[in-house]
Amino acid sequence: MCSSHGSPTSSSPPKRPADPAILARLADAHCHPSDDECFEGALESNASSKLGTICAMSSSLENQEITTKLWERNKNKILPCYGLHPWFIHSLSLSNSPTVPTREEHYTALFPSSTDVSQPSPSLATLLPFLPPPLLLSDFLSTLTNNLEAHPTALVGEIGLDKAFRIPNPPELASSAKNSDLQTPLSHQIAVAEAQIRVAIRLERHVSFHSVRAPQDTVRLLERIRGEPDGWGRVHVCLHSFGGSPETAKQVQKMHPNAFFSFSTIISGRSPRFHELLRAINPDRLLVESDFSHTSQLDAQVWEVFEQICEAREWSAEECVERLETNWRNFLELEPEGTGGRRKTKKQRRLEKAPVAEEVDEVEESNPK
């Protein structure tokens, strides 16, 4: 999910017209039709899309249900995904009490003053009336579990970490800047992301993960989970619209054989090293995505990144679509019991030993708001 996922602006014109036969073999691994401003338009666009699969992410508390409705209207094409995006987790309370804290109690604890943690942030008083009522994390996890159990093929997404996001000011505060200075603490983000990953592991569902300006934190989170014998290697994680450096991508691939990478031109394509990054990914771990909510633009966006991959990897269109088609099919499969990651092809039988986690370069990504 990105600042432009609702914008129909394309990053560059296509080099050739989109081929419907190729699109039919591709999956948009990450998009946001549940955020389309026109629900009926989203239904129509999803039905007319030439893509083989549309992986529809949930992001906020409100659009989990919309994702279900989209799937109900187009079960052959929509793959529903349920989860809470880091932009929307500030309403979740980590309290172990069965009683939901008051709005003031919850947000005062979540957004303390930078100079005195016993006091709330000075910005909170103005914003507090506009913030959503608190919800226990345990209650949301119950909803997440119910949605996944009701949809046996559903994935977990979109979840993750975002160190760029600031809580937006509401329209009622017209004289204020677009964003406040309030940022959901990283510790809170990690707790919520990890809790959702635990649900994914327990129910054996794959994960779509958002990481903005948090490469080291993402690596550490995944490494900690990988070190526990709880079935993490059975499921796959897709690092969507990956914007890290080629060096970071190589490190993640060595450490996490169950990691895939999906790319969009609207986000990943901003990097001057985009083609170098595409070449740094193992050919069997590449996926494509649009990261768009304007569903009428999904085909064009996926086609655009498809062309970029062909160019960067010097693949023919047929070779590229064959690889992406196989990769998507492999992504959806579970690994055998007792494995620590993806099964290797005949050319990849040599086991990779995961190195000790090293510091990695910070990813330069724009503020999503």
Task: Describe the function of each predicted region.
Residues 77-83, 236, 259-265, 340-341:
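Short hydrophobic/aromatic-enriched beta-strand-loop microsegments
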Residues 84, 88-130, 163-182, 302-309:
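Active-site gating loops and adjacent loop-to-helix segments of metal-dependent hydrolytic enzymes
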